[in-house]
Swiss-Prot record:
One of its GO terms (cellular component) is bacterial microcompartment. It comes from the Bacteria. PANTHER family: ALDEHYDE DEHYDROGENASE-RELATED. The lineage of its organism: Bacteria, Pseudomonadati, Pseudomonadota, Gammaproteobacteria, Enterobacterales. Keywords: Bacterial microcompartment, NAD, Oxidoreductase. Acts as the second step in ethanolamine degradation by converting acetaldehyde into acetyl-CoA. May play a role in bacterial microcompartment (BMC) assembly or maintenance. Directly targeted to the BMC. Its heterologous expression in S.cerevisiae increases the level of acetylating acetaldehyde dehydrogenase activity. One of its GO terms (biological process) is ethanolamine catabolic process. This is Acetaldehyde dehydrogenase (acetylating) EutE. One of its GO terms (molecular function) is acetaldehyde dehydrogenase (acetylating) activity. InterPro entries: Acetald_propionald_DH-rel, Ald_DH/histidinol_DH, Ald_DH_C, Ald_DH_N, Aldehyde_DH_dom. It catalyses: acetaldehyde + NAD(+) + CoA = acetyl-CoA + NADH + H(+). Its EC number is 1.2.1.10. It comes from Escherichia coli (strain K12). Has a very strong preference for NAD(+) over NADP(+). Pathway: Amine and polyamine degradation; ethanolamine degradation.
Length: 467
């Protein structure tokens, strides 16, 4: 065969590929499609392979193994692509989601028997579920949602934030490859090659999708609420306060607060966002925080920093956070005002008033406002005010059971952590399962596979009651 013959064969093969009637294959890697229509069609076919609980278990086991195996690579890619967060903390999140997200074991049918017979209540899938994921926790959210939604019998079409599309697509590809290698269906997890706002908006009303899961900020949640005609499960913003009273173990509180408020540079909505401390222990607490790789700013330095971090401050004191500084390292933020801090610095903190924009606004960066109050009653009241009715997360450090009980009742958040960092409420250092989707706007709270099922009732009249 001469060169001309080879060229003719190549042309014929290419022509055949271009004219094929099959849906377009993944354009980059497994599960990444050129069009939304093809992605959803592939996920719909794949979902039929999840009828068997054994197949769901097989797929989840593969996801857990792949998620943990590639946790560091995905963490590094996330920081490289988005510029936000810390590799070690993202690694910890990825591993935690792979290990700690519940699978099919949390789904139990209910059986009711009585004089009139037997009723069975089963957990049914929705089918293809749309999942909108954030740039702040990209790989961790993909791993978590993949396990939860597959456990519930669903396949998933992901709409990742465009700023984190590479790491999100990489995570989807790696998990798909693991599922297929283990003997599971192709394309249980899909996305599009070029995700954008229009893609997400199309998913809000896309035919054949019954459930929409949104993990993100206030804007995307409100957009979904406004435009979707589907069942919506939404995880939104928070401004978690942490209260320290005069009975607290201050050394433990200082360590927990710095750890939580600096974790992944404070880009998790559940991280501590404002510290409220009783005046009698405030100075000692802040001194101990400085021993935990935190640096205290002066009022003048905070005044310099405010216009760098916040724009368009309204009459409530709430501002728009500059995206350039979300999730950036404390050292880089300090350098923006010419301040050099030790390399190991994880957190900047500063005393403010309760009305200061730093206290009112969810900053999502390692800058923590500290507000003094006269007593624990004032602290709890201020915590409720600054939490802003998000019902997301709060924490308290105290040895007084009555004080903790009062705050637990008053704050009314989905997660309330006592004597530990807020991330303990996500299974990172505390008991309980992990999630990256904390659905406070729609009320489901800390999600699991149980959140993503349809309950179906099957009734047998006058039979099968055997006692």
């Amino acid at each position: 065969m001469n060169q001309q013959d080879i060229e003719q064969v190549v042309k014929a093969v290419l022509l055949k590929m271009q004219s094929s009637d099959t849906p377009s294959a993944a354009v980059h890697e497994m599960g990444v499609f050129a069009s939304l229509d093809d992605a959803v069609a592939a996920a719909k076919v794949a979902q039929q392979g999840l009828k068997s609980v054994a197949m769901r278990q097989l797929a989840i086991a593969a996801i857990r193994e792949a998620g943990e195996k590639h946790a560091r690579d995905l963490a590094e890619l996330a920081v490289s692509e988005t510029g936000m967060g810390r590799v070690e903390d993202k690694f910890a999140k990825n591993v935690a989601q792979a290990r700690g997200t519940p699978g099919v074991e949390c789904l139990s049918p209910q059986v009711l028997t009585g004089d009139n017979g037997l009723t069975l209540i089963e957990n049914a899938p929705w089918g293809v579920v749309a999942s909108v994921t954030p740039s702040t926790n990209p790989a961790a959210t993909v791993i978590n949602n993949a396990i939860s939604l597959i456990a519930a019998g669903n396949s998933v079409i992901f709409a990742p934030h465009p700023a984190a599309k590479k790491v999100s697509q990489r995570a989807i590809t790696l998990l798909n490859q693991a599922i297929v290698a283990a003997g599971g269906p192709e394309n249980l997890l899909v996305t599009v090659a070029n995700p954008d706002i229009e893609t997400a908006q199309r998913l809000f009303k896309f035919p054949g999708i019954g459930l929409l899961v949104v993990t993100g900020g206030e804007a995307v949640v409100e957009a979904a609420r406004k435009h979707t005609n589907k069942r919506l499960i939404a995880a939104g913003a928070g401004n978690p306060p942490v209260v320290v009273d005069e009975t607290a173990d201050l050394a433990r509180a200082a360590q927990s607060i710095v750890k939580g408020a600096s974790f992944d540079n404070n880009i998790i909505c559940a991280d501590e966002k404002v510290l409220i401390v009783v005046d009698s222990v405030a100075d000692e607490l802040m001194r101990l925080m400085e021993g935990q790789h935190a640096v205290k700013l002066t009022a003048e330095q905070a005044q310099q920093l405010q216009p760098v971090l916040l724009k368009n401050i309204d009459e409530r004191g709430k501002g728009t956070v500059s995206r350039d500084w979300v999730g950036r390292d404390a050292g880089k933020i300090a350098a923006a005002i010419g301040l050099k801090v030790p390399q190991e610095t994880r957190l900047l903190f500063v005393e403010t008033t309760a009305e200061h924009p730093f206290a009112v606004t969810e900053l999502m960066m390692p800058v923590l406002p500290v507000v003094r109050v006269a007593n624990v009653a004032d602290a709890i009241a201020l915590a409720v005010k600054l939490e802003g009715g998000c019902h997301h997360t709060a924490a308290m450090h105290s040895r007084n059971i009555e004080n903790m009980n009062q705050m637990a009742n008053a704050i009314d958040t989905s997660i309330f952590v006592k004597n530990g960092p807020c991330i303990a409420g996500l299974g990172l250092g505390g008991e309980g399962w992990t999630t990256m989707t904390i659905t406070t706007p729609t009320g489901e709270g800390v999600t699991s596979a149980r959140t993503f099922v349809r309950l179906r009732r099957c009734v047998l009249v006058d039979a099968f009651r055997i006692v």
